[in-house]
Structures are given as structure tokens and as C-alpha cells.
Curated annotation (Swiss-Prot):
Transmembrane segments: none annotated. This is Male determiner protein Mdmd(V). Residues 641-757 form the MI domain. It comes from Musca domestica (House fly). GO terms for cellular component: catalytic step 2 spliceosome; nuclear speck. One of its GO terms (biological process) is regulation of mRNA splicing, via spliceosome. The gene is Mdmd. Residues 36-47, 93-102 have a biased composition (Polar residues). The M.domestica genome only codes for one male determiner Mdmd protein, which is encoded in the M region, and can be located at different loci on the genome (chromosomes II, III, V or Y). The M region contains a cluster of tandemly repeated Mdmd copies with only one intact copy: other copies are degenerate with large truncations and frameshifts and are assumed to be non-functional. The presence of multiple copies in the M region may preserve its integrity in a hostile non-recombining environment. This protein is encoded on chromosome V. Residues 167-180, 201-223, 869-909, 963-1001, 1034-1045, 1119-1130 have a biased composition (Basic residues). Keywords: Differentiation, mRNA processing, mRNA splicing, Nucleus, Sexual differentiation. GO terms for molecular function: RNA binding.
Length: 1174
């Protein structure tokens, strides 16, 4: 049969090709119209081939097919009885009808059409290959897009994909068999009609928008293709159709799945929340209400219905607001879940409303209103609303932090919950690189650190986390965080903050960040230099909680993991009424009697702040205990027990902060505060050396509770009055203890007004106390800052006892005291005042000591000249005899006065006649002119010295003259033993002047004899002449002597620098060394001439002896001894100098003053400004 078919096909090849070409041209020209007519004609011609023919064709194929595949291929063809399995009944009837009607014309038409189709397929082979490549590209692109859509959706089940793959395999096999069947069969019309019918059905299902020409061309290409390629091509086409079906079906499934949870959400919200609770319980999270089963058992059906109506999301039935209010009013049972949910919603509204009204002035008022409501039940809502409000308005962060600080002082668990949520929010934002959330949360944490709600360790951890990975955003967040809490961190832990600033400096030097961020770092350093003056830690109006009343939470970034979001949801409470009553009682204790008043009774913000601070202090509870009439035992056993407990707590604690917390928890009464302070002071005094633990502890206690400041002030005043009762060790410990309190400003500096430093009230114990007290203050503050503190106007009145300015004697004593303890720099003002004081004292008419001493000599000068002359005329001898013993006393006083004047670089001036007013005026003029070159301190000592220089008026008596002269000689002998060289010079001068003095004595004797003989003749004339001559001589002698002595003393008082003095000594030593050689040469020359040896000893006396020759060894030995002596002196000087704390120049002047003038000296060193007075 195959051979006959092949022979019949050969002669018909050419016409078929021609027809195909003509058909192709016509199809191309006609376009869509020809394709439509072609499909309409084919619809009527349905395949009705016999089943046996199909089976024979399948068996004659080159490759074998299994039976199942054969049956599947033959399923669509009708059997002999006319039935078809796959087609519906109508189709099978139509096929039978067509087969019977067209049976006569069938064989001729089929042969012609099959030949034409084959010729057209050969001509269109090239166009088919091109179209195939394009189809492959499109199929690849669609497969990719489908794979991405399927991966994104992820909702297609595995079973569906398996069924789809099987269906694809079946259809591809059917297609391959049909195409192969068309090639080996004579009646090609059957194959063409079946395939076109199938394509039409697929187009109807999909509703594709492609043109009929394109589908027709693809159909023809599929016919032309070889049997090996045809299954793949058909497979790709079928896959496209299946993909479209699968995508549409997938979308439907996804839509169904999305609609399912909406129905579930409409269920009861209460049970959904309780399921969450049960899940949290299984995970180990806390739940107060028990498991879900217990809660479901507790709620009745009636309560559940009302709860569904009020709390479900859909709202149940459509309820008007009036009807909803009526339903809510009917619910009065507080134990029901509906009532509790309504109360919770009302609480949520109140909290949101109050938090939105907060500002700087109304913080205290709003916190009081919040504390009236049960914020313990709504703590989750409260924290959530505060965080949300702070995120929306970051400028009010400090206000929200102050409100949280007040709530935290009363309910620490609420403050801890809010802080945990903030930390978790910051960690999540940091992980997601959300800069805005990081800024808001870190800003809030910084202000909580300032309010002492959060510990500073949390702030340091956040800073290290941000700076470890220095990006632009991280550094910007760190800078804003440091600006807000930098002032507080520098107060608490300055070293760690300094390390963070060093890291920022390194980041700035690297220059890897943006210029804007680098500029921000520079601005931060400038803010730090200014001391964060524009970024204060707490504003005064927001410092509402005392330090001792605040509870600080120590949280770490790693520890905080669970934010407790379940507290934001509603939970049913069995004991609702009892819990509400407990909270009301607690709020009354917190707010006091004002808790029951109306909101308008709180008044302004300032009054509310004071009321809140009084509540915070907790004094009302103590007063209630005293007024309740309870008997308080204040006998000794209680005091002993108190001492024991305090002593044990002091010894058991490792840190002063821990100890302060424990001591403040003891809740001491007001009468026990003085005893408490005294116990602390006794424990400090009993130590061998001072321990800073006690100073830090008292500072902490005084800052936590300011009522302890006054007892410590009273104790300080008592100790200043009773220093003689204490041991030196206790005195030192107590003085250092109070110095620490003053340095830290724990107590005010006004307590120093009880100290008086005068010569009359000076006691050794008090001096020891003041010495150690001031030295400890200088160690803490430094001399410059301490002096600056003392010069403030506030302390001017309190330091009048320590630095007196009323009396020069007290001034001098205070200066000497402070210089002796090494604090002479404090007394610069007193030294200047002492220089000015003697000038102003005589001019003033006050009753000071200066005026009283200066007024004494004026009384002696009040006598007139006439009275003196009358007295001295007749009673010269008597006056001399009477005044001789008084002169001795006066001269002894003169020696003391001269020593004082020599110590203060001054000269002594004698007054000869008090009778002569003219001579007195001249003397005062010379005195004032000479004193201009001398320091002002010398004038004061001269003024204080007693006036004992008045001479006797009985100058006519020779005996008085002789005695006066002899005593003058003795005075010169007593004065001059200070210097050996001066002695020698004065002895030589005395030896030269001795004959002149003898002659003078003789002359005076002759004058006396002549005067005695001529008394009877002319008493008055001789007396007057002799008096005038002798007065003139005495004036000349006094002036000459005073001038010479002034010059000598002034030269001695000219202070020379230590370096110049050493150079002078070295020159003298060098001259002394070379003196023996000069004397040797001179003596050798004298001996040659026959003259005696003219060598002089150290005193200037000549010696007649030979000079002993020195050997070199002896010279070396003496030099070494001299060096040893010099080294020992210098070593002792350096040791004393270091002990006194002086420089070399000061020590040299000090030693000179101690040796020559043990009264005063002043250093000329520019660096030291050291003065010493005695």
C-alpha cells in the first residue's frame, strides 16, 4: 500500500508545487480574509478516518510505540459503531453525518489537497527555519519571565506542577503521532482537518490577540518539519499555552488564599490576642492571666457577645454612636471583659491627651494628673505614646525626659520599660541603617542620662558602637549624642569621654569622611572648650527630682532583647476592682491630700513644682509619725544601736556610693541627724591618717539630702572653739575632712567667719588646725585659684578674722603666720595695707594704737621756753642729780630702739633740746628728708619706738657733761661688737681722737672753774652765752654722727643679690691667697734695707716675725679643708632652704636677716614675691 501511494504521488509533484506557489501568493495578497475563509471551509470537513487505517499507519512507522501510546493516539478517531471517547456527543454525531454525506467525493479531493500541501511545504522551508529561531528566542524569554513570576508568588503546589507535566507529556506525544501519521498516509486531509480543529479550540479557550495569518504560517511550518524535530516544536507551543493557563490559575489560587485570612481576621480579636499570649507562655515569656484555656473558661457567652460588638474590627452589626453609648452605659459589671476593654480605651485616650499637652511649665501638673490614673495597668500604652510623641517632636525631648524622671522616681518599672524599648529601637535602626530613628532614640537616651534615669555606661557603649565603624551617619549621630549628654559625662567620667574625643580627633586627621561631618567634629571640639554652655545637661526649671530620690537603671546594649510589646494589648483581669483600689491608695500616698482635689486646684506651674518637690522629699510621712501620738524612745540604748549600725555599714561597704545609699535608706529622724554627722566625724578622726572615703561620703550625703548641711556647719564652729580638747592627729584628720567639704562646696564658705587669727587669741592647737586646713585646701585648689577664691566679694566679710585690717599688730601677726606655713602669697594685700597704714594713722583722729603712741611725745613738748629757763636757772644741779637715773633707763631703751631700727634699715635721730622750738622744727625737717629713701616699714617701727631721746636742759653743770660723754663712749662700745672689722677701724679712730677728747675735757674743767668764779658777777649773761655755744656744738656733733651712721646703716641695708655676694667673697678669698706672697716680697725688701718685718695680722696690728714658708702639700691640704667646709655649709643651706620652701636668693636674704636684722626682709626676686615680717 505504501508503494502504490508513492507511485501515485510522483507525477503530481509539479502541479502541486505550482498550486502551492499560487496559493501562497494569493494568501499573501488576500491576508486575513483568505485565512478566515480557509478555516471556515476546514471546519465543515471533520476527520472521519477509520480506526484500522490509523493503526496500520502507526505500526508501519520506523520506530516502535508502546500500546498505551497507540491507544491514546487512536482515542480521538471513531470506531466502527460511530462512537468517540474524547469528543462530546454532538461532535461525534456531526462527524458521522459528514462522513456519510461526503463519502462519494472524498478520495479525489483528498489526493489533490495533500499534494498541494506537500509542494507548499517544500517551498517554505527557508522561511520556516527563520521563524523557528525566533520562536525559540520568544520561548526562552517567556520561560524566564514565568520562572521569576513563579518564584515571586511561591504559592503553586507541588501536586499541581506534577499534574501539569503529565498533561504536557500526553499532548506532545499526541501531536508527534499526528504529524508522523500525516506524512505516511495518503489522505492528508484527515490530518489537516484534525490539527486545525484542535488549534481552533485552543484559540477559543485562550482568546489570543494574534492574527490568523501568523497562526496559519506556524501551523504550516509544523507540518513541514521533520519527524525528529516536530515533537520539540509542538512541545514548546503547548508549553506556552499551559503557562498561560497555569498563570491564570495561579492568580486565582493566590486570590483565594488571600481572601481566607480576611475571614479569619473577622473573628473575635480577644481570642486572637490570648492565642498570642499562650504562644508567649510556651516560649517562656511572662503572662499574668494564665493560659488561653483558663481565660476562655472565665469569660461567659454573654460577655463574649458584648465584647464582640464593642471590640471587633468589623464592629459586628452597624451601630450608630448613640446606640454604642447606650450599650456601654448598660455595662456596669466591672468584672466583665467588656467593661475592662472600655476602661482601657478611655485610659489610652487620657494618656495620649495629657502627653500631647506637655510643655516646660506644665510638666509637674500633667504628671500629677497621669499619676491619678492607673498608669501601672497602662504602662505599655504610656511608654508607646511617649516614644511616639518624642519622635514626632524632638525639640521637646528634654520635657519628656523630665516627665519620665518624675514617673521613674515613683514607678521604676515604667522607666525601665521605656528605656528598654528605646535601646531596642536604637539597635534595630542601627542594624537597618535608619539614620532618623537612630537620631531620635539616641537623643532621648541622652536626656535620660542627664536626668539620671539611665546610667552613663549605656551612653559610653552607644558612643563606642558608633565610633568603632566611622561612617558619615554614625559619626553624625555620635556628635549629636555627645552634644546633649557631654556635660554630664564629663562630670561623671571625664577620662572615658577624653578617650572618645581622642578617637574623634584621629578620625578627623584621617580625612576619610565628608567635609560636612569634619566640620561638625570641629564644632564639637569648640563646644567642649566652651564647657557645653549652650548644651546644659538639665535646665533649672526641669530639675524636679532630687538626686537621692532618683532610681538609675544600669542596662547594657547586649542584655536588652525583649521589649514586652504584649503590654500594649488588652488583657482580662480577674481581680480588677482590688487592683484599682490598691492603686488609688498608692496614688494618695504619692500625691498627698491633693490627690482628691480637682484639676483646677493645682494652680500655676511653680506652685505645682513646689508641691511635687515636697511630695518627693517624703517629709509628710515622718511628720505623720510624730503627730500620730506614738511614743519615741530617745534614750541611750537607741543611740548606741544607731552608732553600731552606722559603724557596721561604714566598714562593710566597699564604695562610698553604696554606703551612701545604705545610710539614706535608714530613714533617720530630724533629731538623729546631728548624731549621725557626729558619728561620721568621729570615725574619720579615729583613723591613723585621713581617708578620702569619709570626705566623699559626706559630700554625697549632703548632695542627696540638704538637711545634713546645717549640722556639719555647727560641728565646724564647735571644733574651732574647742581645738584645745583634741589630739594633734585628730585635729589634722578633722581639718582635712572639712577642707574636702569646702572644696567640693558641700557646705558653704561662710563658716570661716568663726576663725579669728590674732596674737591674743592664738593657741597652738588652733594654729595647727588652721595650718593643716589651709594647706589641704591649697593642695586641692592650687595657690592661684585659692587666692582668687578668697578675693571674691562674697567672702570679704567672712575672712575678716583670718586677715584682719583694723590693727597693724594683727596684720603683722597674720602675715608672719601664713608666711611661716608656706602661704605667703595669700598676704600680698595685707603687706600693701601695712605699708600704707602708718601714713594714714597719724592724720586720723581715731582711737587707734598708732594715734595713741604718736600723741605721747607731744605732751612733753608742751612746756614753754620761759618756764624751762626759770626752772634751770636755780636748780641746775638738782635736776642733774635727779635725772641721772632716768637717763640710764632712757639709754637702755635707746639701745633697743636702735636695734629695731637697724633691723628695718633705718637710722636713729636724736633730739637735743625740747626747749628750743626752732631746733625741733629743723630736726623734724631733716628727719622727713632722710626718710624718703627708706622703706615705709621702717617709719612705722620708728614711730612705735618710745621717745627717749630728750636731753637735759642743765648744760651749765660740768658733772652732767662728763657723765653724758662717758656714757656716750660706753654706748659706742656696746653697739660695735657686731663686726670685727668695724671694731678695728673704730679703735684706730678712737686712738687718733683720744688726745682731742682729753683736751676738750680739760677745757671744760677750765670753763667750769671760770664759770664758778664769775657766777656772782654775771650769771645771766654767761649762762646764756655758754648755753648757746654748747647747743650749737651739740647740734653739729649730732648731725654729723647721725649722718655717718645713716650712711653706714643704709649701705648695710642695701640688699645685694646672692650671685653678686658670692663673687665678692670669691674675690676676697683670691686676694687673701695672694696676700702672703706680697707680704713676703715686701718683707724681703725691708730686711735687705735693715727695716723690721712689717707684716700685719688680721686685726691690722704689725707683727715682727719671719714668714714661715709653706710647702705645696700644706697648701693643698688647706685648700681641701676649705672646700669641705664650704661644701658642708652649702649642703646645710640647701637642706634648710628645701625645708622652708625658698629659692636660693630668698634663703640668702633670710639668713642675712636672721643674723643681722632678725625683724624683716623682702625678696627682690621677680619670681617669688616673698616677704617676711616679725
Amino acid at each position: 500500500m505504501n508503494a502504490t501511494d508513492a507511485e501515485s504521488r510522483k507525477p503530481e509533484n509539479k502541479p502541486s508545487s505550482e498550486s502551492s506557489s499560487s496559493g501562497s501568493t494569493s494568501g499573501s495578497s488576500d491576508g486575513e480574509v483568505s485565512s478566515k475563509t480557509y478555516f471556515k471551509n476546514n471546519k465543515s470537513k471533520v476527520l472521519s478516518g477509520q480506526r484500522e487505517v490509523v493503526l496500520e499507519v502507526v505500526r508501519d512507522l520506523s520506530y516502535t510505540i508502546c500500546k498505551e501510546a497507540e491507544e491514546k493516539l487512536v482515542e480521538r478517531f471513531p470506531r466502527k459503531d460511530g462512537s468517540n471517547e474524547m469528543l462530546p456527543k454532538e461532535d461525534s454525531i456531526n462527524t458521522n453525518h459528514n462522513y456519510t454525506t461526503d463519502s462519494n467525493e472524498h478520495p479525489v479531493e483528498l489526493t489533490t489537497k495533500t499534494e498541494e500541501c506537500k509542494n507548499t511545504e517544500k517551498t517554505k522551508k527557508k522561511s520556516f527555519v527563520r521563524a523557528l529561531s525566533k520562536d525559540k528566542q520568544l520561548s526562552a524569554y517567556r520561560s524566564r519571565s514565568r520562572s521569576t513570576r513563579l518564584s515571586y508568588s511561591g504559592h503553586i503546589s507541588r501536586t499541581h506542577s506534577v499534574e501539569k507535566s503529565l498533561s504536557r507529556y500526553k499532548k506532545s506525544v499526541l501531536r508527534s503521532r499526528r504529524t508522523s501519521f500525516g506524512h505516511g498516509r495518503d489522505s492528508s486531509t484527515t490530518k489537516r482537518s484534525v490539527s486545525r480543529d484542535k488549534d481552533n479550540r485552543l484559540r477559543r479557550r485562550i482568546g489570543s490577540s494574534r492574527s490568523h495569518t501568523r497562526s496559519h504560517s506556524r501551523f504550516r511550518r509544523s507540518e513541514k518539519k521533520l519527524p525528529s524535530r516536530s515533537p520539540r516544536r509542538i512541545r514548546s507551543q503547548e508549553r506556552r499555552h499551559e503557562r498561560r493557563r497555569s498563570m491564570s490559575s495561579d492568580y486565582e489560587r493566590i486570590a483565594l488564599r488571600r481572601s481566607e485570612p480576611i475571614k479569619r481576621r473577622d473573628k473575635d480579636e480577644f481570642f486572637k490576642n490570648n492565642k498570642k499570649v499562650s504562644g508567649d507562655i510556651k516560649k517562656g515569656k511572662g503572662n499574668d492571666n494564665g493560659t488561653v484555656a483558663e481565660l476562655e473558661a472565665k469569660i461567659t457567652e454573654r460577655q463574649r457577645k458584648s465584647l464582640d460588638i464593642l471590640t471587633s474590627r468589623t464592629g459586628g452589626a452597624c451601630l450608630t454612636p448613640d446606640k454604642l453609648r447606650m450599650i456601654q452605659a448598660e455595662i456596669t459589671d466591672k468584672s466583665s471583659a467588656a467593661y475592662q476593654s472600655i476602661a482601657r480605651e478611655a485610659l489610652k485616650k487620657y494618656i495620649h491627651g495629657y502627653i500631647n499637652k506637655v510643655n516646660v511649665d506644665s510638666v509637674a501638673v500633667i504628671t500629677r494628673k497621669l499619676l491619678k490614673d492607673n498608669i501601672v495597668r497602662g504602662r505599655g500604652v504610656l511608654c508607646h505614646s511617649i516614644i511616639q510623641a518624642q519622635a514626632t517632636s524632638p525639640t521637646f525631648t528634654h520635657v519628656y525626659a523630665a516627665m519620665v524622671a518624675i514617673i521613674n522616681s515613683k514607678f521604676p518599672n515604667i522607666g525601665e520599660l521605656l528605656l528598654k524599648r528605646l535601646v531596642i529601637q536604637f539597635k534595630r535602626a542601627f542594624g537597618c541603617n535608619d539614620k532618623t530613628v537612630c537620631l531620635t532614640s539616641s537623643h532621648f537616651i541622652a536626656h535620660l542620662v542627664n536626668q539620671r534615669v539611665a546610667h552613663e555606661i549605656l551612653a559610653l557603649e552607644i558612643l563606642t558602637l558608633l565610633i568603632e565603624s566611622p561612617t558619615d551617619d554614625n559619626v553624625e549621630v555620635a556628635i549629636t549624642f555627645l552634644k546633649e549628654c557631654g556635660m554630664k559625662l564629663t562630670e561623671v567620667s571625664s577620662d572615658r569621654v577624653g578617650g572618645i574625643f581622642e578617637l574623634l580627633k584621629n578620625i578627623l586627621h584621617q580625612g576619610k569622611l565628608d567635609k560636612r561631618v569634619q566640620y561638625m567634629i570641629k564644632v564639637l571640639f569648640q563646644v567642649r572648650r566652651d564647657g557645653f554652655k549652650d548644651h546644659q545637661s538639665i535646665i533649672e526649671s526641669l530639675e524636679l527630682v532630687e538626686e537621692y530620690a532618683q532610681f538609675t537603671h544600669l542596662l547594657l546594649l547586649e542584655d536588652v532583647t525583649y521589649p514586652k510589646d504584649i503590654l500594649n494589648e488588652f488583657k482580662f483581669d480577674d481581680q480588677y476592682e482590688t487592683n484599682e483600689e490598691k492603686y488609688k491608695a498608692l496614688s494618695k500616698n504619692i500625691l498627698g491630700s491633693h490627690a482628691s482635689d480637682s484639676d483646677g486646684s493645682f494652680g500655676s506651674g511653680s506652685n505645682s513644682e513646689t508641691a511635687l518637690s515636697d511630695c518627693d522629699k517624703g517629709k509628710n510621712e515622718v511628720n505623720d509619725k510624730y503627730t500620730s501620738g506614738d511614743i519615741i524612745d530617745e534614750t541611750k540604748p537607741n543611740l548606741i544601736a544607731l552608732r553600731r549600725t552606722i559603724y557596721l555599714t561604714l566598714n562593710s561597704c566597699l564604695d562610698y556610693e553604696e554606703c551612701a545609699q545604705k545610710l539614706m535608706k535608714m530613714q533617720l529622724k530630724t533629731c538623729q541627724q546631728n548624731e549621725f554627722c557626729q558619728i561620721l566625724l568621729d570615725c574619720c578622726a579615729e583613723q591613723r591618717t585621713y581617708e578620702k572615703f569619709y570626705g566623699l561620703l559626706t559630700h554625697r550625703i549632703c548632695k542627696m539630702n540638704k538637711s545634713f548641711i546645717e549640722p556639719f556647719k555647727e560641728i565646724f564652729k564647735d571644733i574651732c572653739q574647742t581645738t584645745h580638747c583634741l589630739d594633734t592627729n585628730r585635729l589634722r584628720n578633722i581639718s582635712k575632712f572639712f577642707a574636702h567639704l569646702l572644696f567640693t562646696d558641700a557646705i558653704s564658705w561662710d563658716v570661716l567667719d568663726c576663725i579669728k587669727l590674732t596674737e591674743d587669741e592664738a593657741i597652738t592647737s588652733r594654729c595647727i588646725f588652721i595650718k593643716s586646713f589651709f594647706q589641704e585646701l591649697v593642695e586641692y585648689m592650687g595657690l592661684y585659684h585659692f587666692n582668687k577664691k578668697l578675693k571674691t566679694e562674697v567672702l570679704a566679710g567672712t575672712l575678716a578674722g583670718l586677715f584682719p585690717k583694723d590693727n597693724p599688730r594683727n596684720i603683722r601677726f597674720s602675715i608672719n603666720f601664713f608666711t611661716s606655713i608656706g602661704l605667703g602669697g595669700i598676704t600680698n594685700e595685707l603687706c600693701q595695707l601695712l605699708k600704707i597704714a602708718p601714713k594714714s594713722a597719724p592724720s586720723s583722729s581715731s582711737s587707734s594704737s598708732l594715734s595713741s603712741e604718736l600723741s605721747a611725745p607731744s605732751d612733753d613738748d608742751s612746756s614753754s621756753d620761759s618756764e624751762n629757763k626759770k626752772k634751770h636757772k636755780g636748780k641746775n644741779k638738782k635736776m642733774t642729780k635727779k635725772k641721772n637715773p632716768s637717763k640710764k633707763k632712757e639709754k637702755t631703751k635707746k639701745i633697743v630702739g636702735k636695734n629695731k631700727i637697724a633691723a628695718k634699715n633705718k637710722t636713729i635721730k636724736r633730739r637735743t633740746d625740747k626747749d628750743n622750738s626752732s631746733s625741733k622744727d629743723n630736726f623734724l625737717k631733716s628727719e622727713s628728708s632722710s626718710n624718703e629713701s627708706i622703706s615705709l616699714d621702717s617709719l612705722s617701727s620708728e614711730l612705735f619706738a618710745p621717745s627717749s631721746y630728750s636731753s637735759s636742759e642743765s648744760s651749765n653743770d660740768s658733772e652732767s657733761k662728763e657723765k653724758h660723754k662717758g656714757k656716750n663712749k660706753k654706748m659706742t662700745k656696746k653697739k660695735n661688737p657686731s663686726n670685727k672689722r668695724e671694731k678695728t677701724k673704730k679703735k684706730l679712730s678712737k686712738n687718733k681722737k683720744a688726745p682731742n677728747k682729753n683736751t676738750k675735757k680739760r677745757m671744760t674743767e677750765k670753763d667750769i672753774s671760770s664759770s664758778e668764779s664769775s657766777i656772782s658777777e654775771s650769771k645771766s649773761l654767761n649762762c646764756s652765752a655758754s648755753n648757746q655755744n654748747e647747743n650749737e656744738k651739740r647740734k653739729k656733733r649730732v648731725t654729723s654722727k647721725s649722718r655717718t651712721k645713716r650712711v653706714k646703716m643704709f649701705k648695710q641695708c642695701q640688699w645685694v643679690d646672692a650671685d653678686n655676694q658670692r663673687d665678692i667673697k670669691r674675690k676676697k678669698r683670691a686676694e687673701y691667697r695672694y696676700e702672703p706672697l706680697v707680704y713676703r716680697k715686701r718683707n724681703e725688701e725691708c730686711l735687705k734695707k735693715g727695716a723690721p718685718n712689717c707684716r700685719k695680722d688680721n686685726y691690722g696690728n704689725r707683727q715682727n716675725h719671719e714668714i714661715s714658708q709653706r710647702h705645696d702639700s700644706e697648701i693643698k691640704r688647706r685648700r681641701e679643708e676649705r672646700k669641705k667646709r664650704h661644701h658642708e655649709k652649702n649642703h646645710s643651706r640647701e637642706y634648710k632652704r628645701s625645708k622652708l620652701g625658698l629659692c636660693q636668693r630668698e634663703y640668702f636674704l633670710y639668713m642675712c636677716c636672721q643674723f643681722y636684722y632678725p625683724c624683716t626682709f623682702q625678696c627682690l626676686c621677680q619670681n617669688c614675691h616673698f616677704t617676711f615680717y616679725s
